Amino acid sequence: MNVKTLRVEKIGGTSMSRFPEIIDNIILRNPDDIFGRIYIVSAYGGITNDLLEHKKTGKPGIYQLFREQENYPRKMLELRDRLFELNQSLVPTGLDLEEANDFIGDHIDLAINILRSMDNVLASGYVSRKALLLAARELLASLGEMHSAFNSANILRNRGYDSTFVDLSGWEDGRQLTIDERIKESFKDIDPFSTICFATGYTKGTEGIMREFDRGYSEVTFSKVAVLLGASEAIIHKEYHLCSGDPLIIGEDKIHPVCNTNFDVADQLADVGMEAIHPKASKPLEINNIPIRLKSAFDPDHSGTLITKDFIAPRSKVEIVTGSDKVASLEIHDTRMVGEVGFDLRIMQILAKHQISYISKATNANTIAMIIADRDSTPELLADLGDKFELVTSTPVAIVCAIGSNIGQPGILAKAAQSLAADNINILAVSQTPRQTNMQFIVNRSQFAQAQRALHGALCM
């Protein structure tokens, strides 16, 4: 008996910008495997950066103009023209240009009117500025996903396939639905085994998907759709494989796809900013025993990397070497610390006040050192800590990690340390828990890439 299995698949923005290849490599690759797949799509590459702010550099987008009450309507119209050009480029792929331009053009005009109304309400001073700005941010974010999802369904329909645009953005829908309720409501009359579904990566809900997840919202939508609809597998299509190291640092010829790992390893990666998937999106999948498959959209013959709950590598090995050079070592030295119960609790309370989570922590009799993100090492934090403790310093450093589902073998830590020493790299601090999934080395920032190459060469080759 042929049992129908549903897969929910996320396609990122960079991949969406190469949509003709996505059609060939993913959507229509196997004529016998077209349906039973729901695609959660991001905006085309760079569009959400223009709408909100650049994800990496922080360069302001339209949202910032609205927040500062500058000329956002002009920028919205410039963006509309850019989207019209993008639509034009998709005509050879099958896009109906008139329908596509009417759709996004109407939504941009409506968005400008809504933002103007918000502007007037903000000026009145009668409502919470924070709440209204969040609503404006979500409104803008939704435009990018609506555009790409509508276009995708339109293209497939014009190529002769039954396809459905699933709009989770809640535009012109005044019902007060939670995110889960909107997903259920939107899919209740859709049979994904008879139509190709393209759903927006943004979902409108009373709790505000960006309030907690901000730019990670599309992965949260992806996760929730997979759980609520009972998917057998959740697939993420990226422009690259999840590999044993960064090809730009280690070299393309020296790395390899991971192929299999577990959710614990995925958590370790997220902790240093190398997100295989947003940790708050992966948890519901892990709890519901839905495996995640990470695939390269442009290497369709490779099965990708499967992340499951219980996978343990059959032989002990390091699966990934990664890290971050955008971290600081926050060090608190205090002679009163020795033997005092709860001393570090006071430090944690100050970090919690500033909403800071640390990546790694090392202690001795009178010193506690934590690795935190550079952006969190603020003068305000240091001043608060300095008021309570004897000596507080913050030093720019790098963290390099050797991670695997099965690295608990005698000598592996020594081998890692020796590889760094052989390359004249001084270890400033080292950390590993008895669970033995992540060896963390703190090194001088200038030796970040060098340390990764040394560890990868010793542990992953």
What are these regions (language model features)?
Residues 161, 231-232, 290, 356, ...:
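Short glycine/serine/threonine/alanine-rich loop segments
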Residues 1-277, 282, 442-444:
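Nucleotide/pyrophosphate-binding catalytic subdomain
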Residues 303-461:
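A conserved regulatory-domain signal marking ACT and ACT-like small-molecule sensing domains
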Residues 171, 241-242, 300, 366, ...:
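Positions that flank functional sites
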Residues 233-237, 292-294, 359-360:
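Short hydrophobic alpha-helical runs that function as membrane-insertion/retention elements
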Residues 42, 297, 363:
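Conserved H-loop
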Residues 262-336:
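A conserved active-site cap/scaffold subdomain adjacent to cofactor or substrate pockets
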